[in-house]
Each structure stands twice: as C-alpha cells, then as structure tokens.
UniProtKB/Swiss-Prot annotation:
Main location (coarse class): mitochondrion
Keywords noted in UniProt: Elongation factor, Mitochondrion, Protein biosynthesis
GO cellular component assignments: mitochondrion
GO BP of this protein: mitochondrial translational elongation
Region (Disordered): 248-268
Gene: tsfm-1
Other remarks in the entry: This protein may be expected to contain an N-terminal transit peptide but none has been predicted.
Subcellular localization(s) per the UniProt record: Mitochondrion
Family (UniProt): Belongs to the EF-Ts family.
Protein name: Elongation factor Ts, mitochondrial
Compositional bias of kind Polar residues: 250-259
Molecular function in Gene Ontology: translation elongation factor activity
Length: 317
C-alpha cells in the first residue's frame, strides 16, 4: 500500500514537471517580459511557465525576487575581484551637484548601457538627496559624503540592493568608490563636464570630471554654460590643485615706461608673466588662449570662479 501511494505521488509530480516543460510560451510574451525586466530569456521563460502569459505582474515580481537572491550571492562571490575600470559622473542643478565614481572589472562592462544606467541612477539619487541638505554660510563649495545605503532610487529601493542586482545581471564585481554631493554659495551656479565625453549633456561621464562654481555679474559675449564648459575643460586638461589668488599678469606700456631704454612713443607692449608650472587655477595660462590667465579670461566675461572640483577615475578620495 505504501509503495503504491509513493508511486502515485511520483507519477503525479513527474506529470506536472512534464506539463510545465511542454507548456508553450509565445515569442511575443517572452520578448515583452525580457524587454521589461532585462533578465535572461531562460529566466523569463521560467516565469511565464510558472504564472502564465496573462499574469505579467507576478512574473515580474518573481523574476525580481529571484534576481535579488542571485545578485546578493554573486556579489559576495565576486567581491574580491579587482575593479580597475569604470566611469566617474557629475550631475548638477543650479546650486547642487553630485559626483559618483563607479568601478568594474572590464572596459567592456564600463561601456555598456546597463552600467551607465546604474551610474546615472546612483548619481540622480545623490543629487536628489543633496537638494534637501541644509548648509551653513560660506564662500566655498560645501561637500557631503554619502554611503550607498543612504540612497534610494525613484521606486524607493535601496541602492545597495540595486547594485547587487546589477552585479548579478552583468556578472562582474562592481564597487562605488565615491558618492559626493556639493552645495554652492548663494549667487553661484554649478556646472560639470567630463572627458572622454560619455553619458549625456545633462549627466556627463568619463575617466575625468570637473565641477565649477561660477558667478557672473552681467551677461558676457558667451553664455554662462559655454564659459563654464571651457573652464571645466581647462581644469580637466591642466590639473590645477588650488584656486589661487586673482592676479592680472598682463603689464601694459605704462608699466614699462620707466624702464631704461623704453620709448614711450612706441606702440603699446603687452608682456605676460605666466609660469607654465603654475598649479593655482586662476594664475594658470588659459588653455584656449595661453596669452591670458584664467582669471583674465573670466574677468573679460564678467565672471569669476568661486571653487572647483576635479576627479580622476581611480584617483585619491
């Protein structure tokens, strides 16, 4: 009697498994679920077999739960692998900005859409949090460091979970090396840029980024955004270490007239005194016009830089 009942249960179980294996899933439903979730066709098919094509919501829920378990497990397994590739991002909105460095194992993953989407997700979350950050008065940028666990996406999901899901999906170790937010002093606007240029105009990404706090007293011959973009390029290319003092380096004929042998009736002479090894931003020769200092170029456009940030992938924190 016992053997017979056991045989019946085994037969019943085998029948259900066979029915599930033979259950057909339409190509359209499979494509829809794959596009909606981004998970593999194999797992999408499992979800559709389990819940049917008419219950997409539960299929999606099941996939996400399965992916979360797989992601945490894979994240733990891959956690010791070196992450020497990746991207740095900068996103700004008037007086607030966020800078995020996300690393991975290979350049192939760093160039993928999924990796850039993850970086954008973290960046926007940090920017959103920074807008509610209270600040004290001051003439410089105020910096805030965020832990990934303090951030959530638009759906309220913790960013640590989002990162683990991405690790499970992409199959590489990834690490968030920095999440920083900045608030600018009153009357200044934040602008960012990257190199090589990746991401989008609204959210630049690259191996290098720069962020500049710009104040413009009146409209110049070019827009604030264009001017800030030029200064950001200079910061990335010339690697200034400090802001420095605003000093005019050009000396006109009047400054030279007292020198012995100088003819005061001669044409005006302009002499520049710019040190090529200068590390202070405002005293550096402006990259796009080396005959002027950065300060002089800004002054010609009725603008000034209050503060700046430069970050290189894998650089110092």
């Amino acid at each position: 009697m016992f053997a017979r009942s056991t045989f019946v249960r085994l037969l019943s179980t085998s029948g259900r498994q066979l029915a599930e294996a033979e259950k057909k899933v339409s190509k359209e439903a499979l494509m829809t679920l794959r596009k909606r979730t981004g998970y593999s066709y194999v797992n999408c098919r499992k979800a559709l077999v389990k819940f049917g094509e008419n219950d997409m919501e539960n299929a999606v829920k099941w996939l996400k739960e399965a992916a979360a378990k797989e992601g945490w497990a894979k994240a733990a397994k891959l956690g010791t692998r070196v992450t020497s590739n990746g991207l740095v991002s900068v996103v700004s909105d008037n007086s607030a900005a966020a800078v995020v460095e996300l690393s991975c194992e290979t350049d192939f993953v760093a160039r993928s859409g999924a990796f850039k989407d993850l970086l954008a997700n973290i960046s926007n979350s940090a920017l959103s949090k920074s807008k509610s950050q209270s600040v004290s008065g001051g003439a410089k940028l105020q910096e805030f460091n965020y832990d990934l666990g303090d951030l959530t996406d638009k759906e309220g999901k913790n960013m640590r979970e989002v990162l683990s899901l991405a690790i499970g999906k992409l199959g590489e170790n990834m690490a968030v090396k920095r999440v920083k937010a900045y608030k600018a002093p009153e009357g200044t606007t934040l602008f960012g840029a990257s190199h090589p240029k990746d991401g989008s105009d609204e959210l630049p990404m690259g191996r290098f980024i720069s962020l500049v706090a710009l104040k413009q007293t009146s409209k110049g011959s070019i827009s604030s955004q264009q001017l800030a973009g030029q200064i950001c390029q200079h910061i990335i290319g010339m690697s200034p270490e400090t802001l420095g003092e605003a000093v005019d380096t050009a000396k006109s004929q009047e400054g030279l007239s007292s020198q012995e042998g100088h003819d005061p009736d001669a044409d005006p002479v302009v002499v520049t005194n710019i040190d090529d090894s200068e590390t202070a931003l405002l005293r550096q020769a402006f990259m796009l016009n080396p005959s002027q200092s950065v300060h002089e170029y800004l002054k010609s456009h009725n603008a000034s830089v209050i503060d700046f940030v430069r970050v290189e992938l894998g650089g110092e924190q």
